[in-house]
Amino acid sequence: TLDLLANDLFGLLDGLELNQVHYIGLSMGGMIGQAAALRDASRFLSLSLCDTSSRIPLEARSAWNDRINLAQGEGMEALVPSTIDRWFSANFQAQRADEVDKVREMIRGTAVNGFCGCAAAIRDLDLTDRLSTIDLPTLLIVGEDDPGTPVSAHEVIRACIENSELVVIP
């Protein structure tokens, strides 16, 4: 769950003897940052949340179950094509094939159990209704063509966190 991942974050901060930090989270890291700030905002000076979301729509949850089942049945290789297409626009894939290849290798190297646990946490993500309680300077960053976490998902977070700014990268 995201609560367990937030626990891991707090454990890391404690282990590094960091009482307060400027937190930067990308994708799932942004989800973890939201969950952690909801639990103990005093640990953060600011949040920077990139290419993330605060809620997975009900209609998208079955897709996460499908990904979990595919990983368990066929391994991570089976997820590579659809993940690349979800994470990168066709234009980016064509222009930056070298970078996309690095991500393909990262996906292939991901442990199935770790993926399945994180995918279940993402599937169950539903923080939007609580975000208005976050009183931290918050920077939201998203690419305008991000197919996985669209600008609209960041606009929802922006509307909920009063002291937030949204930057859309062309």
Where are these regions (language model features)?
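Conserved alpha/beta-hydrolase catalytic His-Asp/Glu region
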Residues: 58-63, 74-132
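Short, surface-exposed alpha-helical segments at coil->helix boundaries
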Residues: 3, 97-101, 151-155
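Active-site loop/oxyanion-hole signature of alpha/beta-hydrolase fold enzymes
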Residues: 1-24
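Short beta-strand/loop motif that positions the catalytic acidic residue
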Residues: 134, 140-142, 146
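Residue in the alpha/beta-hydrolase core beta-strand immediately N-terminal to the catalytic nucleophile
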Residues: 22, 45-48, 132
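Flexible "cap/lid" loop of the alpha/beta hydrolase fold
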Residues: 31-81, 87
